[in-house]
Amino acid sequence: MLEFKHVSYHYPATPPVIPDLSFKIEKGEFVALAGSNGAGKSTISRLSNGLLLPSSGEVTVGGFNTKTTRASQIARKVAFLFQNPDRQICQNTVREEVSFGMRVQGFPEEEIKARTEAALETFSLNGDWSPFTRSRGERQRLALASVLAGKPELVILDEPTTGLDYKECTAIMDHIAKLNREEGLTILMVCHDMELIQSYAGRVLVLNRGTLLGDGPTRQIMKDRELLSKARLRPAQIPDLALRLGAGFEDVYTVDEMAALLQKRAGHKEGEE
């Protein structure tokens, strides 16, 4: 679905932000791109959707080279959800906002109407609302509805839960995870929050200064304290606690697993007494 082949990128008169990067994301994967500030996450996300073109190397999306494919064709395959929803909201009503991207891409009018109404229903949005009078959580839901209405094959999420409370965060991420699980939507989530990554991503790419330090299943990456330290990332709490507790806790990964093991150990102690 998305492949980087020896990609480098540099801004004019500066050293490379991305020196030499290669990775591949298959259709239907939920992948997190993790790194601290300055790791190159934003540059990679913009290279992934064709907003930036590589200085050298090749980026392909669904088999199409971003350097040689029309931007409109890439836009039909890749959707981008900004960290701040206000960066993409520009229409007077919610309905106009959801339909705007599809109209720009040249979708037939009847299809635009059908997809818009379906998106409004899915995300419980009133099409007549003004986007600028809604809460941050509602605006983020609107931005996501707009992104998904065009049925992209790959969605890039840039720190998608920044500024949201726990309830709003869970609602949005659960919906994204459901689309990934049930419809095979490919997700690339740019994120530094390891708790969020642990909860949703199946695989993690760990970056530091544009270099790929690690690539593997989330469970494996979460237990590699040396790797996370090199990338200046704070470990998720439960896997880190399990590593600190040592023998017998090595395989513990979630709150439920930790609770089950502690309960089991407590039961053994009661039996011994």
Residues covered by each model-derived region:
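Helix-to-loop junction immediately C-terminal to a conserved catalytic motif
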Residues: 49
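Conserved ABC ATPase "signature" C-loop
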Residues: 209-210
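Conserved ABC ATPase "signature" region
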Residues: 110-127
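Conserved ABC transporter NBD signature motif
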Residues: 57-65, 74
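The feature captures the beta-strand-to-loop junction immediately N-terminal to the Walker
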Residues: 34-36
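Catalytic Walker B motif of ABC-type/P-loop ATPase nucleotide-binding domains
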Residues: 155-158
